């Protein structure tokens, strides 16, 4: 497995993997128009390219070998958008941790999480924060294995639909 940072050349493949992963897990929850609006906002090639170019957002990718195709990714923010919910002085944000649905359970998520925690520590962060859907029990168990715990109830919007999410935090 190769672990590497994203470049602008990855925008199209990263957008595709983001859309596929999100739809595989959550498509059944939303009206078609809400899902379409969200996917355009979050996973259009242009939106992903803007994020890759943003120095405050860091994507890390996995692939089997150079050029073989993306198998998983993590999107992080150097400053958590949820800082007001914590007493941490410098919380780091974990935005997405998605794996190709056919590759779940192969350790890709664990490799990316290990990278994330080490990267946050290297940046002097004292916490990592993430949001997780209140009914995504598998993801919650994964995060809890790393020591994350719930610190708040928050909202996540997909189009005009509001989801109940949990804000998880791990103090470093």
Please annotate each region the language model reported.
Residues 1-3:
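Extreme N-terminal starter segment of soluble prokaryotic enzymes
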Residues 5-9, 16-28, 36-102, 113-115, ...:
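Acetyl-CoA-dependent GNAT
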Residues 9-10, 107:
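Short helix-adjacent coil turns
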Residues 60, 90-92, 126-129, 133-140, ...:
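C-terminal "cap" of GNAT-fold acetyltransferases
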Residues 100-102, 106, 134-135:
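Active-site acidic-Proline motif in GNAT/NAT acetyltransferases
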Residues 106, 123-126:
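Short coil/turn segments at alpha/beta junctions that flank glycine-rich nucleotide-binding fingerprints
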């Amino acid at each position: 497995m190769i672990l590497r940072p994203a470049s602008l050349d990855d925008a199209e493949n990263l957008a595709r993997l983001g859309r596929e992963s999100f739809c595989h897990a959550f498509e059944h929850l939303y009206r078609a128009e809400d899902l379409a609006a969200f996917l355009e906002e979050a996973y259009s090639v242009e939106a992903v390219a803007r994020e890759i170019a943003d120095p405050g957002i860091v994507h890390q990718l996995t692939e089997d070998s150079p050029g073989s195709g993306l198998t998983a990714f993590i999107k992080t923010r150097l400053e958590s958008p949820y800082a007001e919910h914590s007493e941490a002085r410098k919380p780091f944000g974990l935005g997405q941790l998605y794996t190709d649905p056919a590759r779940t359970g192969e350790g890709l998520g664990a490799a990316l999480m290990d990278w994330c925690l080490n990267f946050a520590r290297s940046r002097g962060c004292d916490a990592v924060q993430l949001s997780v859907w209140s009914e995504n029990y598998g993801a919650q168990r994964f995060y809890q294995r790393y020591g994350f715990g719930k610190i708040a109830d928050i909202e996540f919007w997909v189009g005009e639909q509001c989801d109940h999410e949990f804000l998880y935090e791990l103090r470093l």
